[in-house]
Amino acid sequence: MTGPDARPPPLAEQVLERGHEMRTTLARAAAMLPLRPDEQAAETFMELPPARILRYPAANAGSAMAPVLIIYSMINRPYLLDLQPRRSVIRQLMQAGADVYVLDWGEPAALDRDLDMEECIGEFVRTAVSAIRAAHDGSRLNVAGICQGGTMAVCHAALHPESVQSLANFAGPVDFHTPDNTLWRL
């Protein structure tokens, strides 16, 4: 049978229908794949082995906005702040005119097991803050800490308030005197 009203033979119909089902299934499977970060390009501002400080320059050079230091948790990856162009804390801060710095602890290794909070705050965070302030004519920083980094940020701000313009703590524990000392045992 030929012409515009002609139907394909039954086997061809089955193949076409099966192909449509496969395309639909593949599209659903692709939507469930893990999200890969589309990270904004960063420069390494400073190496502090095992950590490093990443710098994301402000979108408009010469902005009067104070720099932002994000102190991330040692066990999480900071790219979570920069997953996609429209879902990026880092890009939003850059667009607002901030130079953004991220303290990236790198992948945990056996050598890091002896790092304690005193060393992390007293050496790594303090050194990062000092270097960033020096690069910005001594400006005080907007400091944001996430999870364990929030605890470090709060401790640094308490020890060195002269270096901090503002402080944001996202999910960082600060009360270690709960009735059962729950956080202390973690």
Model-derived features with residue positions:
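N-terminal cap/leader regions of alpha/beta-hydrolase-fold enzymes
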Residues: 1-186
